[in-house]
Amino acid sequence: MPAHEIIEKAIRKVADFPKPGVLFYDITGILVNPKAFSYCIDCMEKEYSAAEVDAVAAIESRGFIFAAPFAVRRKLPLILLRKKGKLPGETYGINFTLEYGQDVLEVHRSDVTRGQRVLLVDDLIATGGTLNAAAQLLALGGAKVIGIFGVVGLPFLHYQKALAGFAVKTLVDYSGE
């Protein structure tokens, strides 16, 4: 079975989670399948092999899972973007709107440097709102997002609009099925 098919088979689709009418794309099947998990990281490595990247930034919490092994392989710093109040010390913060309310992302001020070229990673790209806020957050410290990577993309939720101007790469796209 081709590796790409292994990824698709590993992603469970859970109806009515976390609330009625929502189809949840569960990536945990990738994590318990070493071949699928390795394939994800291999794809990131191949996609960004020629890219000038100074650091990898990851969205809490499932973005950490995919960004960390890539950062280790490339010997790059890993910048954690966390929810409000989870980071000690001085932070940059940004408020943003979700489909179900407001949220805040923060990053340590000391982790972001002016001119830093950052690859932004999350497990799933839905509306693009969180990733757009993350890019704005990194810009507060002078960093520039050179690409956005997600294992799963949901283009039917129009993330392309929120992330216009960014080079977005996903491994698997779903059309709402």
Where are these regions (language model features)?
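Phosphate-coordination loops involved in phosphoryl transfer and adenosine-cofactor binding
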Residues: V53, R114-G115, G165
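Active-site-facing substrate-recognition patch
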Residues: M1-V53
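Short glycine-rich phosphate-binding loop at a beta-alpha junction
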Residues: V53-E60
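Short, glycine/charge-rich flexible loops or terminal/linker lids adjacent to PRPP-binding catalytic cores
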Residues: L76-V118
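Short Gly/Thr/Asp-enriched flexible loops that form oxyanion-binding sites at enzyme active sites
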Residues: I65-R74
